[in-house]
Amino acid sequence: MAGGGGVGGGAGEHAAAAYWYDACEDGASLLCGIDFAASADFDPGLIPAMDTGADDGFVAEIDRILESINAESSPAPPPPPPPPLPEPVPVAPPELPIQEKQLQVASAPVANNAVAVVGVVQRSKGVVARKEPRRESHGCAANGGGGGEWRDGKRPRLASGGVGGPRQEWRRRPMLPPPPSRGWDDRRGRRDFDRVRKHEHHRREARGFWERDRGGKMVFRSGTWEQESDREAKRARTQDGGSMEKKAEADRMGAAQREKPVAEERARQYQLEVLEQAKSRNTIAFLETGAGKTLIAVLLIKSVCDKMLKENKKMLAVFLVPKVPLVYQVLVMTAQILLNILRHSIIKMDAIHLLILDECHHAVKKHPYSLVMSEFYHTTPKEKRPAVFGMTASPVNLKGVTSQEDCAIKIRNLESKLDSVVCTIKDRKELEKHVPMPLEVVVQYDKAATLWSLHEQIKQMESTVEEAALSSSKRTKWQFMGARDAGSRDELRLVYGVSERTESDGAANLIQKLRAINYALGELGQWCAYKVAQSFLTALQNDERANYQVDVKFQESYLKKVVDLLHCQLTEGAAMKSETSDVEMQNTEKHNTNDLEEGELPDSHGEHVDEVIGAAVADGKVTPRVQALIKILLKYQHTEDFRAIIFVERVVTALVLPKVLAELPSLSFIRCASLIGHNNNQEMRACQMQDTISKFRDGRVTLLVATSVAEEGLDIRQCNVVIRFDLAKTVLAYIQSRGRARKPGSDYILMLERGNISHETFLRNARNSEETLRKEAMERTDLSHLDGTSVLSPVDTSPGSMYQVESTGAVVSLNSAVGLIHFYCSQLPSDRYSILHPEFIMQKYEKPGGSVEYSCKLQLPCNAPFEKLEGPICSSIRLAQQAVCLAACKKLHEMGAFTDTLLPDRGSGEGEKTEQNDEGEPLPGTARHREFYPEGVADILRGEWILSGRDGYQNSQFIKLYMYSVNCVNVGTSKDPFVTQLSNFAIIFGNELDAEVLSTTMDLFVARTMITKASLVFRGRIEITESQLVLLKSFHVRLMSIVLDVDVDPSTTPWDPAKAYLFVPVGAEKCTDPLREIDWTLVNNIVNTDAWNNPLQRARPDVYLGTNERTLGGDRREYGFGKLRHGTAFGQKAHPTYGIRGAIAEFDIVKASGLVPARDRGHFSDYQNQGKLFMADSCWNAKDLAGMVVTAAHSGKRFYVDCICYNMNAENSFPRKEGYLGPLEYSSYADYYKQKYGVELIYRKQPLIRARGVSYCKNLLSPRFEHSDAREGDFSENLDKTYYVYLPPELCLVHPLPGSLVRGAQRLPSIMRRVESMLLAVQLKDIIDYPVPATKILEALTAASCQETLCYERAELLGDAYLKWVVSRFLFLKYPQKHEGQLTRMRQQMVSNMVLYQYALNKTLQSYIQADRFAPSRWAAPGVLPVFDEESREYEPSIFDEESTGCELQKESYDDYADNMQEDGEIEGDSSCYRVLSSKTLADVVEALIGVYYVAGGKIAANHLMKWIGIHAELDPEEIPPPKPYDIPESIMRSINFDTLKGVLGIEFQNKGLLVEAITHASRPSSGVSCYQRLEFVGDAVLDHLITRHLFFTYTDLPPGRLTDLRAAAVNNENFARVAVKHKLHVHLRHGSSALETQIREFVKDVQEELLKPGFNSFGLGDCKAPKVLGDIVESIAGAIFLDSGYDTSVVWKVFQPLLHPMVTPETLPMHPVRELQERCQQQAEGLEYKASRAGNIATVEVFVDGVQIGVAQNPQKKMAQKLAARNALVVLKEKETATKKEDERDGEKKNGAQMFTRQTLNDICLRRQWPMPQYRCVNEGGPAHAKRFVYSVRVNTSDRGWTDECIGEPMPSVKKAKDSAAVLLLELLNRDFPDKPDGKQP
């Protein structure tokens, strides 16, 4: 945020934060630890939000001190903790049995004294046992069948307890008894062979493995891949800086050292003496620097705290410090922070119990200490005032005292101000023991000769710059002098801490630099002045902000002249002569610092220095003072542990002296650095200051050149030398700087100019004043002698001196008004081209008698509520400024620009405020914030009639119901007869459905080449008896139990009246009586059959089929993983648990043959001759089986019977697997069933049944077929291969439901899903009460996660734009005085997702939303409970992830993963009545509803919906304010070419003031014209709405994603900026920034080059970053047209449609290079990574794909550099793809031949040589989700030579590629090891 300049200088970029501290970076943290609850008036929300950071070091230090104090009363200190033992190396314990493992986990000990610390994760540090990962076989064929793989790291599934259940330990699953033999004569022998092979596998593994080195060559490595990987990782860690174990050990030792108690620091006697007095009364502790005043304050806090705790009261203690650096040592806040808090009434003075003031001598004049006491402490009743404790090294902060009486008066003033008594110690022996006094030495130097010529030339430059500044601006002499000398700059920094941006005024900044150079020239010499000028010039050239400042070139040209003028060199040749150096060093050792008492250096050193720089002193290159300093420093070149501080007055001296001293070889023993504070132009950051102090402490720096910042507060190491290069200005500075020399035997050297009377007088007064102050303090024991002598000046509380808000108590006074106005200007919206600040225009009035008075006119920036205000006539310039600023503050508060706390209003007047969530929880309105909501059911479906027929329910009357038939029309054709052979159904409801529901046609995606359009047709009203209803209900339950696979009993199933309807079968013929259309015969047969007694007929058992083939029927996806619903997986030789889905298992673990009923061979020949077949439970006529459903007794699967194959029986050979060339596994079908299921077929001569599996009920509303244009000719071939299976009749049970009935019923759940959704939409439509089609409302309620043909995303896009426009228009018109920043924040609070989410909850929209993909298994049909979908979503982390160290941590990681991965609608339990919705979904639905209402009914309908939802954004006509009058100067009107603008826009403005405002930038000096920011605010919303509407209605079939891309390409600042350049709107821009002019010129040049390219239009994706201002003026012109046309958006579109031409289209839509590269890498499964770095003003971005750099780009903007780098990477990848394609074309024949090495090639070799299939193993899996990498190994058993060596492939982005890489390596190994070709062919 830019700041203000004006009289008081500019406000800084971080003015908002700086307001709360004096140039401090972590201001808000200063309030941490304060119990604001002690004040009932405190409102924490009033403190502005900012980044905070607590000073943990200080808190730890206080704890340590208090512990040491408490230790005095304890019997004996606790022994120090033993040093930590080295962490033992993890050792894997032996594998425990399952029961022992579980017991071990359950009985983990918990420490009794464990303490739970919030925010701290406690980890156990015991021995961590490594668990051996389980290896699980997946389909490994016994005879080389299908191959297989060994893959480590697969964790077991969760137990049946679900998410919250315990995890299973890592162990091998207990194997169940094996089935009968299946092809080998000796199965036990086969297992022994496998065991031997595994042993050989591991033996070979221990030998080594093959892999490729970096050059691509095959290399053999010993051991395993994991061991080699660990060795490489350790080598890499060692190269990076040592062993990680050593580093960890060092960290542990360091932590132990830190935790070890330091030597006890006990309070000294004199500290306790002062403490006792402070406990009884307000006290000012007068003690030397280093005497431990802070400890006394801490002890006082502890004492008061203990007292308040005993009284059960809350305490608020405030520790104040005068400067920011002190905060980092002694807490809590600077005085300015407390002053601001009190002034803005955030807390009250009576809420503070203890007030501690460090360095309290600053409480004079207008210092914050003084203002806190005078404005708030003394105005508070005495009984409510806090206790005060002040600390100082000198109660008088002046040049000294003249007498004992003068000293007493000054101390009285301080005591009165602080309402305290000065206290010091009388016995100084203990103090002198701990704080030794240094030896004070005076060194005199000669006065410097003045270089008049150079001085005059620099002064002349200063005068020239000042005159140029005056001539370039239209300000008066008084105005400029006021800006420079009125003193407001100091007040601004002191009061509000707003960093002054003097660069904003290039002339004033340059004058300051020239004055600093001139000072260095006179005080330090020409050489030093040259160094200063050179530093200024270098800093200016390297400053990143220099590109955006107005007068940079102007400053640079003058500084170059000064550098050339002062250029000189300084040599030190004489000092390096060896013949003199040795002698001088020896002589130096003979002297000590005692020789300096007389103020003269030994002659030998004087001669030596004269040889070194004597000529330079004579020439004026170095002054005698610098020469004397060098002499002093040379005296200490052999001093052991030398530490020194040189105190200087000016910052320029502190900056240049280290450079001077560093260039003198004779002072090479010194390592010098600067230490400056914050209150200067060359600010030193706090982190840099602490770093310098740290270096000084550990010896990397031995000499500090410091300003007054080092005099007090900072924790600087004890020094043995302190040099006052510039004499102190006050007694306090004299005492405090001396206190830095606390080391025994140290020297305090004062440098005095020879013959300077003022220097000698000050030194004499300082010495006398110190003694006088100490004497006076000892005599002051109470305040009784002060009665009637108080000199405290009363606070000016006259009405004109302050302004107070009655409601809050906030106050602004003359002292704070100027700073508050500057702070307000810094908070106004601005950019880097405009630095907003107030301007003061002074008017002088001369009165008779020679007196002068002044008045001040205040001019605020152009985007303030008012621009000019004239103040009253006052006696001084400063008072005139204060008076006008105070009046401005009052006016701003009355206009609403200030809140009631007198802080700038940020725009919180409209909408709901942001709610604060607990830490770590996602905020409402975000996608991650999810909650459970009940599923909505339409009220029309409710019916008590569904409860008829229950026990005890008597009703003899007819029940009146409504019947609707399901009408299905097929679109397209299909050769599959099962798709079209369906039964007809009707649905019975208790209420009549809405006509819109009947008119709705839903698409059911039943086949790849056919879609069924279903709808409901009203058949009529029916009346049925209770007995008929019971029969229909039983049929409904039986039907749905089969469709949904739920085992329920019609007599016991519960019915819910909230959802009352029934499915009934109907005949094909229509009848006049709809009741007769029901197929009652079918209903009776199905309900009354005895077949339901067999559990296999009621629901499908969950069994493992032992294969992944779909030829056995059923759903491959469901059974392919061999996992049952209870989390149990089985191998090939295991038997499953037969569990009824949706119910409790009724069978134990048994052989499959146990379910097959007993059969008899007796009458087989007779029945065969009669055309009957022996089924599992009865005999059936073969002709009657066609179309029926049969249940396989051996597996529990159900099948549709297609036909009877009389030419096949069970003795036919079993078909070979596709692609398998090995020996036959099963000789016949009978052999297959015997080996596979243990079933011995009896009727082997019976013909087989050709059947197709009955699939689960599917979601037919979602398009399931990607390729709808598949060739119909391919269907029959795929059908035969995929779906048909041949079953022996004796293993089949005939199901009571016909096949056509089941297939027809499987469509009913999808149909009712859409019907129920439509009923909810109709219900919501009736509630909203506006005629909009219910189908449109349903579209707005359906999320994309449903994966249906309906989706709200397009409507949401339109509704979002319309909502933004309506709210923007409302705010713009309602608040004409608020600026653009306030309006933007208010709009955000009205349209944010969090607010819309609350609106949705208020209207219970969560009950109407369809957000989950329809799953029939979870659908709640009437009378049938839903079941949980068995697809597991468990989290299976890789073994290469970090192992968790406890059960709690494992559960937490799973929960986090589930939260992140869960989508809308997904639930974690068995429930269909609740679903999970993100709060963002609810907010999106609100916008989508606005969109559909706008489409259906325009603005009126959309506004009606917004009003219903709770968004009030309409103004009554009488509330709309009249147009703002414009009084634009004639000179401005003449400067604008209105005719040209009329030609470009095609419209003439009625109010030309709007157009002038639309093209005026904030950098333009205010002259009665506002800037365009408010017009840009409303214009941005208008254009966004109009362009979005155009795209929405133009491209009606465009998917939401593409429509969003079109909108983003059309509505962006880059595109608008190019529109401005294309139509030359930029030439009319009124601004006052040369930097902006340069950027516009460069951008125009680039755009003109782009436009020359044929057909080129980047739509904002060009290579040149556009200045935001250009896009802003396009939006502001749109806003001006909108207002000038009477708020008519059609006029705006009429103007801008040709301006925006050519509009982006789907064909011309450019994809952002970053997105294009991201999508390409995702499609190719390649890892993408960006690495960014910055060097100066240039950002560099590198692009890596799979770890290889393929693109790089540089640009000042990081985003632009990323875009260019992505574009370069795409070019490289496309060129690479083209080259690869050409190479493939050239070598196509070779690649298509036998030499193309893949896994298939390796499999073919194994088949031909009759080897077992290759064994693959995953050896590594890691990396982030977007850059996953897999490493696989492979080996093969060659039978004759045993196992091959393991071959490790390269890291690949997919498992397939990783296996291929390993296979290629193994093929190369086989080619090398076998003399003949591996494929079996002889060479």
Swiss-Prot record:
State the residue spans of region: Disordered.
Answer: 71-97, 129-188, 221-262, 577-604, 901-928
Span of domain RNase III? 1320-1498, 1538-1686
Q: Bias regions of kind Pro residues — which residues?
A: 75-96
Principal cellular location given in the protein's record: nucleus
Which gene carries the instructions for this protein?
DCL1
Q: Which family does it belong to?
A: Belongs to the helicase family. Dicer subfamily.
Which protein is depicted? Answer: Endoribonuclease Dicer homolog 1
Quaternary structure, per UniProt, is: May interact with ARGONAUTE1 or PINHEAD through their common PAZ domains.
Top EC category: hydrolase
Instruction: Give the location in the cell.
Output: Nucleus
Deletion phenotype: Severe dwarfism and dark green color. Seedling viability compromised.
Occurrences of domain DRBM (ranges): 1712-1775, 1797-1872
Segments forming domain Dicer dsRNA-binding fold: 817-912
- Organism (species): Oryza sativa subsp. japonica
**Could you tell me which residue ranges the Helicase ATP-binding domain spans?**
274-413
Which spans does this entry mark as compositional bias, Basic and acidic residues?
A: 129-138, 228-262, 907-916
